[in-house]
């Protein structure tokens, strides 16, 4: 899950939101989001975020900038995951989830 906030004149990902990665803690839970985004909870792609942003009156460039920022942060995410208290299997599952979902946002 994710959350946005606007500290000044730009939207940013919240520094902390839903800190429990349910997808690795409970692999039987197949939903990626608790609430729907553009009518979906799973297999979200760029088009779904763009639709939601347009519905909220946000420009496409804001969504694209947020995704670019997430991609830039990926090395830091990997470092944090691997320095965490998680087991090696959980670390791999967590990293795989992050990478897979970011890759999905790049698909057209």
Give names to the regions the model predicted.
Residues 1-108:
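Anionic ligand-binding catalytic core segments
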């Amino acid at each position: 899950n994710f959350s946005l906030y606007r500290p000044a004149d730009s939207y940013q990902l919240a520094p902390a939101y839903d800190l429990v990665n349910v997808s690795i803690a409970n692999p039987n839970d197949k939903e990626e989001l608790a609430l729907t985004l553009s009518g979906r909870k799973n297999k979200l792609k760029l088009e779904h975020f763009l639709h939601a942003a347009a519905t909220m009156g946000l420009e496409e460039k804001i969504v694209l900038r947020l995704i670019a920022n997430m991609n830039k942060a990926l090395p830091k995410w990997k470092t944090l995951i691997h320095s965490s208290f998680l087991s090696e299997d959980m670390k791999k599952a967590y990293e795989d989830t992050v990478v897979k979902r970011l890759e999905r946002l790049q698909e057209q």
